[in-house]
Amino acid sequence: MSTAAGSRKKHSKLHNEERADITKDEFEAIREALSKEEFRKLFFDYVEEVQDPENRKIYEQEITQLEKERGVDIKFVHPKPGFVVKTSIDGELKCFINIASSPEVARPNSEVGMNPETGGRGLSWSIPMAQTGGRDDCDAKNNHCKVFDVVFHPDALHLSTRDSQFRKALIDTALDAVEREYEVALDRANLKYPKLDYKGIARPTVIRKLAANPTPEEQEPHPLEHMYPTKPPASNSEPKILPMKTKAAPVPEFAVPKYSIKQSHDVDLSEYTDELDAKLHVTVPRSLVVEIELPLLRSTAECQLDVTAKSVYLLSERLGAKYRLKLDLPFVVDDKAGNARFDTEKRRLSITLPVVRKSVNQQRQMHDTLRYLSREDSGVELHSNSESPVEDDADGYMPETPELETAAPPDPPALTPSTFLKDSVHYQLPKFDCNALDNAMAFVLDVAHVQPDSIVTLKTDRSVSVKFATIGSGYYPTHYAFYMELPSVDMEEYHKDHCIESIEAEAWDNNVIMKLFLGAESKAPTSYLAGLHANGLKEYQVYGHYKAKTDKNNECEPNPPRDVQIMRTDDAVVITVRPPHTSITTEEDDEQQQQLHKKPSKKQRKRNKKQRSYSESACEEMLDQQDGPLGRKKDATTPMVPQRKQRSYSECNDSTIGSENVNRGILKRFSRYGPRPSMSDSCSSIDDCGFSSHSCSVDASSSLFSQSFNGIPEEDRTEEGLSESCKKTVRFNDQIMKQVFRHDSSILGQRKKNQKRRNCKLRAQQRRLSEGDSADYEETRDTALKQQGEPSGNKLHDSGLDLTGASASHRTDNNSKSYRTRQDHADADAKNDAMMFEMDDEDDEI
């Protein structure tokens, strides 16, 4: 009863009857009245009177006369039995359509027409009809069903019995009328024709039309007109003509039944814990329940059901109950562990299929794979095999996954240049650069985050192919390919027999480096062909040609013996290294010995108190610049001392150079890979130097070499005019400079503020000094200079060259550098935290 009531409520829109609104008191009053014998007798008499045909005729005549007084002609249509069509509404509710006849309906008529598709001639039929309202009824098993009446002219039914095509057109017209009027979907694939002339009790219907020639009495307003609805307008007097269908709707051979998929879950308390794997299966149901509505089937013996891991297929070929359904499941199910049950009362098939869930190990492997892919593109260098310690068990034990014994895969087919790139993959040509070194070529492919395991190379004698892939932030791979081919033999002018011996490809963070090694006796080509593949290559030039450097000092040629002299003095140790003696150098050495034994002057003794070392390479380089090509020819037999320093010469004093374009520099540069100069190296042939004094400073207490040059006096380029004061000196204060920047101020603001404060202090010191104080300051300064020359434990060393000229006609103003003592220097600059140098000018006369 509940099922029938639910279906009746669902299809209440199929009729215009309103639901009875009865209260409980009214229902009790009706029940009490029916319980009385007198009331039941009166009620049955009323029913018999209403159903009496004679009384029905009197009722119809009175209604006709009443409508005629309003100017409306009405006709009562009494359906006569014809045949019945059985189908279903929306695949759920059983439905009967009575095809009846009545002479009150117009006759069908036809016209000769032409088929627009085939061009053949035929008849175009116009079939009038009348419909009654749908009503509820019961079938033979007392189940709820729906009944509709469609009334045609008796001639239409007569033609349907003689012509099958006309009968089919008549049935289609009736079905279209029901679907259009009541907005329902009828099952046309499962039409049945029961052996019935009419379903239920025939009920007449009324056809209303405006009177063609109303009488004056009929035109007068009736006193009861306000009780009836308004007259229809004159435009509605004509019957409604429906548009003719140019193409009939295709009738499906099988009907698609209604179905529903339900996901079934079990309450598992382990899913409500705080474990990491507690909610792995929250979104995966325990089973799937598929319900299929089959109202025309009596049992499952009349249909076929096939279930796979991902789909359900149902087929019923029974006449009047043709169903076909192919359903894809949202989850993988176990087709062997499912079950099906058919409810004969509801005509419903229920299929229960358990869902296949992945194991915990498979879930963890999947999450590890996703984590690996996400970390490969994060830009942070991590080990790919590292696992998060959070995923370990509390006891530190991780279950070992059983290793699957798999057979070794067969060897892949050999790659060829034509099959190296896949047709289904889109490749891009990366940006590249090429460098050559002897018999090797290096290609730099500018592609970042390349997967090392995706690099595949293919080598031939004269070509190389490489392909690789990268994975971006969206886990979408991007494929790259590069093809390089050596030029043909005709293009090579200097070497023709070189070929590629081996290749190496390595992936870095921002690029891929591919190295090509040619034959041992081969040379890198000047050009090459490159592109995405062998077709459409472009020629590129090799601009970076390099040659491997060979160490000439490691040659096995014996070095000639050198003259090494060591002289000890009170303040320093002088080591002199000379090449093999010649007639010229012997005389120069004698003069140097005489100058050394000669009593030095007062100023020279003051300078000699400082320890000096002479740079061998500086003198050799100056000799090379002075002698020129002639000097090099004369000393061809003399072995050259390996150059240990590189210097540039200043261009500021042009008078010392003369007409020759020789550069002089005040900066000294050292080779990054050559040996550092020692502090005791002496300069051979000092008098042969033809340039002015070099002031190249080297700190003996530091491994770093700095350059400080005071000034280069102008000297004659002759041997007599060579200066002896080529000093190289630098001094560093013991104080460490420290600069503190506050976070709430800018650097430029602090710099200006400190400079202003320093200037104010200097002006204040100058104002405090009187004339007498200035004299005391000079005496104190002279005393400090004398103490500086005395030997002490904290002695400053000089590591430069001191070259002076012997010419009496030229005077040079050499700016010799003198420094304050550490105590004086600290007193003068303790507040400024800076290093200051004081330069004293002295004139040297020889």
Curated annotation (Swiss-Prot):
The keyword Phosphoprotein applies. This is Protein kintoun. It is found in: Cytoplasm. Residues 821-832 have a biased composition (Basic and acidic residues). Coiled coil: none annotated. Residues 1-21, 377-412, 581-657, 743-846 are annotated as: Disordered. The keyword Phosphoprotein applies. Its main location: cytoplasm. Required for cytoplasmic pre-assembly of axonemal dyneins, thereby playing a central role in motility in cilia and flagella. Involved in pre-assembly of dynein arm complexes in the cytoplasm before intraflagellar transport loads them for the ciliary compartment. Interacts with Pp1alpha-96A, Pp1-87B, Pp1-13C and flw. Keywords: Cytoplasm, Phosphoprotein. It comes from the Eukaryota. The modification Phosphoserine is found at S378, S770. Belongs to the PIH1 family. Kintoun subfamily. One of its GO terms (cellular component) is cytoplasm. Pfam families: PIH1, PIH1_CS. The lineage of its organism: Eukaryota, Metazoa, Ecdysozoa, Arthropoda, Hexapoda. Residues 596-612, 750-766 have a biased composition (Basic residues). One of its GO terms (biological process) is cilium-dependent cell motility. PANTHER family: PIH1 DOMAIN-CONTAINING PROTEIN 1, PROTEIN KINTOUN. Residues 399-408 have a biased composition (Low complexity). InterPro entries: Kintoun (IPR034727), PIH1/Kintoun_subfamily (IPR050734), PIH1_N (IPR012981), PIH1D1/2/3_CS-like (IPR041442).
